Amino acid sequence: SFFVLHLCVCHKQDKNMNSKELQLLVRCGETSTVQFKERFSNQDSIAAEMVAMSNARGGMILFGIKDKTGEVVGLSYQEIQQINSMLANVATNLLRPVIYIQTETVIIEDRSILVAHIDEGDNKPYKDLSGVIWTKQGADKRKVMENSEIVRLFQCSGMMYADEQPIPFTSDKDINSSV
């Protein structure tokens, strides 16, 4: 239906999601803004995902959902508390600049799912502690390697403007003041 398509493609991150919305997102599968994680298993992988989302359009990581099948497995209360703590640690200590995330727990199929909301960043480019800049490519993440992409991220953040950049091999004598 239109509602399902609209939600899958254009879900706004209003940070409050009900179980019906979450079920529809899970049915739509992973996208560039929605990622599934059964558990918090590797902090470097989660850090890379958070960096990629911050450098792109933002997104959500849904914990308690199998990433290959979309099966809802859920989390215990203790797992939710532990993952919340680990997410805060990653966002504060493993990313540069620091990002701020919001989390919420949503119940679907009588199972608790932790939803971590990651906003598009204002201070791009974001990177992990190794200095790697990640971005989204469809549902996957990839390293940013090209200088032009890095420049674009700076420009998107408003930290660099083309008309303020030096032009190599020029001087003030090259300026045409009659224009």
How would you label these PLM feature ranges?
Residues 2-179:
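Conserved N-terminal catalytic/coupling substructures associated with nucleotide/phosphate chemistry
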